[in-house]
Amino acid sequence: MKVLNNLLYTGDHEWIRVEDNKAYIGISDCAQRMLSDIVFVELPEVDDEIAKGETFATIESVKAASDSYMPVSGTIVEINEELEDNPAALNEDPYGSWIIAVEMSDKSELEELIKPEVYEKICEELDKEA
């Protein structure tokens, strides 16, 4: 299981990579392993405004459907359209296959996210339970 040090994470297994006021958001390696074979991703629309904690995508696998929640509030400026034709990209490269990019409305919300070293321990515990 891989946890990247240049990202922040949520307890719901989303990751966020910040570039100035723009943030790319996806699901972690830990999440894609729990979901297993991803077959469909329901994406939001560009220009949608979504608050922190609200659902921004639904990811369906052969095992289950899972909502993904916004780690920060913002306006969607880009969606990863590749996922419409190739949802399995989230399994193959969860950190390269971002889901959405947002213009953040409150950067202070980043302070509430989980640091990589803490998130790694969370995932290790989940692996032990599996």
Swiss-Prot record:
Residues carrying N6-lipoyllysine: 63
Entry's Gene Ontology cellular component terms: cytosol; glycine cleavage complex
Gene3D superfamilies assigned: 2.40.50.100
Keyword set, alphabetical order: Lipoyl
Cofactor binding note of this UniProt entry: Binds 1 lipoyl cofactor covalently.
Biological process according to GO: glycine decarboxylation via glycine cleavage system
Cofactor: (R)-lipoate
Lipoyl-binding domain mapped to chain residues: 22-103
NCBIfam families: gcvH, PRK01202.1
Protein purpose: The glycine cleavage system catalyzes the degradation of glycine. The H protein shuttles the methylamine group of glycine from the P protein to the T protein.
Subunit structure: The glycine cleavage system is composed of four proteins: P, T, L and H.
Family as reported in the entry's similarity comment: Belongs to the GcvH family.
Protein name stated in the entry: Glycine cleavage system H protein
Lineage of source species: Bacteria, Bacillati, Bacillota, Clostridia, Eubacteriales
Annotated gene: gcvH
